[in-house]
């Protein structure tokens, strides 16, 4: 089942990369699609090595970490090709006094830090899972009946790091949500994923506790891994949308080769599709300015 799903994902990624290369006017995004295809190929190679070498911890952890990166890359492509990203997100209502317009550097910093922290936490969790440290601390919420373990080993240290990481991630997500709610609550494209992050992290912490208390029940453990991926990609969505203005200012949103689009079949398609036509977006942006 795992190999069949992996093959299907690889096939769909090939289709996506080819589609981007043929139809997407933004050169950087076409190459991003190629990089995404490269990541899924590398993921398949790591999967093969994992089997050949009988699940070594280092390769298995790298396999898990690259899977998260590939997932994030596909989500990023979905964001980059969405009408909201291309045309610009509009507040749900008229901005109210005291609220900000475009996301500023503080939100960008907070969201980026949260995303990096979540990914680091996932890597620590994968290390814990593949080194057999999942039950190194068998109780919850205490650790051997104490707030801090009264004895140590490498497995206990990894498990303890994962629990501390959960606290840090929860704090980072709550900080991002509080900042978005206080400054950008009229921006639905930020408020919705920020609020979803809070709900997901509550579920994730609950699943983590249940994983320990159930002695690593396979279903509970699997949903814990799944929810972690959802927390990561939801944070990534907030991060990308917070950085959108800066990315657009650097010209990455618009293909630097659009002037050559008339030389191939993409040109006529873009002219008749205002959402997919970056030149039209430029004119609209200038008109709004």
Where are these regions (language model features)?
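Polytopic transmembrane helical bundles with strong interfacial aromatic enrichment
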Residues: 1-92, 99-248, 286-289
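Short, basic, low-complexity termini and linkers enriched in Ser/Thr/Gly/Pro
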Residues: 86-94, 100-102, 247-285
């Amino acid at each position: 089942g795992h190999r069949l799903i992996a093959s299907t994902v690889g096939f769909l990624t090939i289709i996506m990369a080819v589609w981007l290369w043929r139809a997407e006017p933004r050169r950087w995004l076409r190459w991003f699609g190629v990089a995404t295809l490269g990541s899924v190929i590398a993921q398949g190679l790591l999967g093969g090595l994992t089997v050949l070498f009988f699940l070594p911890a280092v390769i298995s952890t790298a396999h898990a970490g690259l899977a998260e990166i590939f997932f994030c890359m596909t989500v990023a492509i979905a964001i980059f090709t969405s009408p909201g990203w291309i045309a610009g997100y509009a507040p749900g209502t008229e901005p109210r006094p005291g609220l900000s317009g475009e996301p500023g550097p503080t939100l960008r910093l907070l969201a980026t830090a949260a995303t990096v922290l979540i990914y680091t936490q996932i890597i620590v969790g994968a290390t814990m899972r593949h080194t057999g440290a999942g039950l190194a601390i068998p109780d919850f919420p205490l650790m051997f009946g104490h707030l801090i373990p009264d004895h140590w080993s490498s497995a206990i240290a990894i498990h303890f790091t994962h629990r501390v990481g959960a606290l840090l991630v929860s704090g980072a997500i709550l900080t991002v949500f509080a900042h978005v709610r206080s400054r950008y609550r009229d921006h639905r494209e930020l408020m919705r994923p920020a609020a979803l992050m809070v709900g997901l992290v509550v579920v994730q912490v609950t699943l983590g506790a249940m994983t320990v208390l159930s002695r690593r029940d396979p279903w509970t453990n699997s949903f814990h891994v799944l929810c972690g991926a959802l927390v990561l990609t939801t944070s990534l969505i907030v991060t990308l949308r917070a950085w959108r203005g800066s990315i657009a200012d650097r010209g990455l949103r618009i293909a630097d080769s659009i002037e050559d689009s008339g030389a191939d079949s993409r040109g006529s398609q873009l002219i008749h599709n205002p959402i997919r036509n970056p030149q039209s977006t430029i004119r609209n942006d200038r008109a709004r300015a």
